[in-house]
From Swiss-Prot:
The keyword Transit peptide does not apply. It comes from Vibrio campbellii (strain ATCC BAA-1116). Involved in transcription antitermination. Required for transcription of ribosomal RNA (rRNA) genes. Binds specifically to the boxA antiterminator sequence of the ribosomal RNA (rrn) operons. GO terms for cellular component: cytosol. The lineage of its organism: Bacteria, Pseudomonadati, Pseudomonadota, Gammaproteobacteria, Vibrionales. GO terms for molecular function: RNA binding. Pfam families: NusB. The gene is nusB. GO terms for biological process: DNA-templated transcription termination; transcription antitermination. This is Transcription antitermination protein NusB. Keywords: RNA-binding, Transcription, Transcription antitermination, Transcription regulation. It comes from the Bacteria. Belongs to the NusB family.
Length: 155
């Protein structure tokens, strides 16, 4: 991570990427279309936007990281799913869509962004699960990532 990128900007990038990945999973729209909707502020989100929600613009959000996460997860979702599958106790198609988006995002960071410590990846996924997923999803996400980390990261 460059010295100029703040952890909060990365956290915001993950938050927007998670929402965009979730949107892609539901709609299967073109990634560029979804990215543009998020960058323009015209999200699919049916819920009211919170006043405290960060802006998808620098310096508040690492926009380049958002783009990398979104396109990286979408382009490699099948490979990511094959890395996740051994660590989930139920069929992938039975996973909640938000849990799947979280696991794909975290697995992408674990396997493609060795500069991000795996403990940071897991912690960020847990925090996102607490905000965006079902009540106990953070426990499930934590369990899957804890089991997967030693096998996908050689550290």
């Amino acid at each position: 991570m460059g010295a100029s990128v703040k952890p909060a900007a990365r956290r915001n990038a993950r938050q927007f990427a998670l929402q965009a990945i979730y949107s892609w999973q539901i709609t299967k729209d073109n990634v560029a279309t979804i990215e543009e909707q998020f960058l323009s502020g015209d999200k699919y989100d049916e819920e009211e936007l919170h006043a405290s929600e960060p802006a998808l613009a620098a310096p508040e959000t690492d926009v380049a990281y958002f783009r990398e996460l979104l396109s990286g997860v979408v382009l490699s979702h099948s490979e990511l799913d094959s890395k996740i599958r051994p660590y989930v106790s139920r069929p992938m198609q039975d996973l909640d869509m938000m849990e799947l988006a979280l696991l794909r995002l975290a697995m992408y960071e674990m396997t493609r962004r060795e500069d991000v410590p795996y403990k940071v990846v897991i912690n960020e996924a847990i925090e996102l699960a607490k905000v965006f997923a079902a009540e106990d999803s953070h426990k499930f996400v934590n369990g899957v990532l804890d089991k997967a980390a030693p096998h996908v990261r050689k550290k």
